[in-house]
Design a protein with these regions (language model features):
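Hydrophobic alpha-helical connector segments
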Residues: 71, 84-111, 165-166
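Amphipathic alpha-helical packing segments from all-alpha helical-bundle domains
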Residues: 106-112, 117-120, 128-153, 163-167, ...
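Residues in the recognition helix of alpha-helical DNA-binding motifs
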Residues: 61, 71, 195
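Hydrophobic alpha-helical segments that form the core
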Residues: 3-4, 123-125, 141, 158-182, ...
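Alpha-helical DNA-contacting segments of helix-turn-helix folds
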Residues: 69-76
Length: 207
């Protein structure tokens, strides 16, 4: 008698892999359309057509357009390598931690700057996306606050408290500054990262 259990297990794995591929194809199709046409001008039906799936499949995978964008946001930091950032933060002194954070932001903006800009602009008229953008921004601020608050007393420059340090970082390392330096001033992403690293040390640390 032949045991059919392995076959059933393989079939389950195949279905799971296919479902993951379908989700990825839908997400990539949505990103292309959102960036090219804008959030408001893109319908779920168009996303389905672009991905080569049915409309119910899109809804089953992500719920709605906001669910699609949230999934894109969750995946956006993967190319930026958050594990690398974590490792660098755990073992570095403050100047190196700032450099690690600048490097992460550079990688994030390089790979997903178009998506970040889309969400922020669409959030001006779409409440769900405004909420999403605010949540992401606050999460980033929270990480910076956690890092800065762990530094020994006297690490920050005189007159710079924790809140000011977080604000200063956000004012320097953001998608607008990155975009201007890359598109208008002709800088390379690596040069932006190096400049951020140097200016953050000058602005934040007592040296």
């Amino acid at each position: 008698m032949t045991d059919s259990t392995p076959r059933r297990s393989y079939d389950s794995l195949r279905r799971q892999a296919q479902a993951q591929r379908t989700r990825a194809e839908i997400a990539e199709a949505a990103r292309r359309l959102f960036v090219a046409r804008g959030w408001g001008a893109t319908t779920v039906r168009e996303v389905a057509q672009e991905a080569g799936v049915s409309v119910p499949t899109v809804y089953a995978a992500y719920g709605n357009k906001t669910g699609l964008v949230w999934a894109l946001v969750e995946a956006a930091d993967l190319p930026a390598d958050p594990a690398r950032l974590l490792g660098e933060l755990e073992s570095a002194e403050p100047a190196r931690q700032l450099a690690a954070m600048a490097g992460y932001d550079r990688r994030l903006f390089e790979s997903s700057g178009d998506l970040i800009g889309l969400i922020r602009e669409a959030g001006r008229t779409e409440a769900d996306l405004a909420t999403l953008y605010t949540r992401v921004r606050r999460a980033a601020d929270g990480i910076r606050e956690e890092v800065f608050s762990a530094w020994p007393t006297g690490t920050l420059r005189s007159g710079v408290d924790l809140s000011t340090a977080v604000d200063t970082y956000a004012a320097l390392c953001n998608i607008d500054v990155y975009t201007v330096l890359i598109r208008e001033r002709g800088w390379s992403p690596e040069r932006v990262e190096q400049w951020w690293s140097h200016v953050l040390v000058r602005q934040l640390l007592d040296r």
